[in-house]
């Protein structure tokens, strides 16, 4: 399981699995139902990281689990209706994403490239106006999972960097929280 997000309707969870999207119920007993896959012919690709936006859409990234040098990953949008689509292909290691509190823009990491991208989200859920938000050096570590707080500050976990860093919306680092581990993958608050 790469991620687990509570459904807006309170009816269980959505999950990201090796095999694709799934609906999960914990009660009265564990039950898992497939909910679609954007990579049925690519057994080495798996869902990796995801976030839900204020409209109940889940933005999920995928990666080649066997060879991350291959740009077989993608960023997909799973709609509340259950339909999904790949919104960007050609990604190595999809991490993040982080969605602005007002839902108007999103950040996404391609960890293999040490690069964070920014997109504007249109009213109908399309990603447009892609720009490079920030490129990190090898010494800084690899940008992995991330989130935004209610003020729109960006928090990124750094694999190999042993820390979580806070950035303003323009990408200027505000602070660093060092942790007693090197492989930090994500955070939640």
Question: At which residue positions do the language-model features occur?
Answer:
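A short beta-strand motif characteristic of beta-propeller blades
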Residues: 1, 33-40, 82-89, 129-136, ...
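Short loop/turn segments immediately following beta-strands, especially the blade-tip
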Residues: 24-28, 119-126
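Hydrophobic alpha-helical segments and helix pairs
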Residues: 31-87
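Conserved beta-strand positions in repeat-built beta-propeller and related beta-rich domains
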Residues: 7, 13-19, 58-69, 106-112, ...
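Loop/turn-rich, solvent-exposed surfaces of beta-rich toroidal or solenoidal domains
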Residues: 114-119, 126-130, 134-172
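Flexible "stalk/tail and boundary" regions
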Residues: 9-12, 25-27, 76-83, 133, ...
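Beta-rich, blade/repeat-based domains predominating
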Residues: 1-13, 41-58, 87-106, 136-154, ...
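A short loop-to-beta-strand structural motif that recurs across blades of beta-propeller domains
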Residues: 20-22, 73-76, 115-117, 163-165
């Amino acid at each position: 399981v790469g991620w687990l997000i509570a459904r807006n309707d309170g009816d269980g969870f959505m999950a990201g699995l090796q095999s694709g999207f799934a609906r999960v119920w914990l009660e009265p007993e564990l039950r898992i139902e497939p909910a679609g896959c954007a990579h049925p012919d690519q057994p080495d690709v798996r869902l990796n990281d995801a976030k839900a936006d204020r409209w109940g859409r889940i933005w999920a990234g995928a990666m080649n689990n066997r060879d991350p040098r291959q740009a077989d990953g993608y960023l997909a949008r799973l709609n509340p209706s259950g339909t999904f689509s790949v919104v960007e292909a050609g990604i190595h290691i999809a991490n993040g994403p982080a969605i602005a509190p007002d839902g108007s823009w999103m950040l996404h990491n391609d960890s293999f490239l040490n690069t964070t991208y920014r997109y504007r989200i249109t009213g109908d859920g399309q990603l447009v106006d892609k720009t490079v938000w920030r490129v990190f050096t090898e010494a800084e570590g690899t940008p992995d999972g991330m989130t935004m707080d209610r003020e729109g500050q960006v928090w990124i976990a750094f694999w190999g960097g042993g820390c979580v860093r806070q950035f303003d919306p323009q990408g200027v680092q505000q602070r660093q929280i060092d942790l007693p581990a090197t492989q930090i993958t994500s955070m939640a608050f």
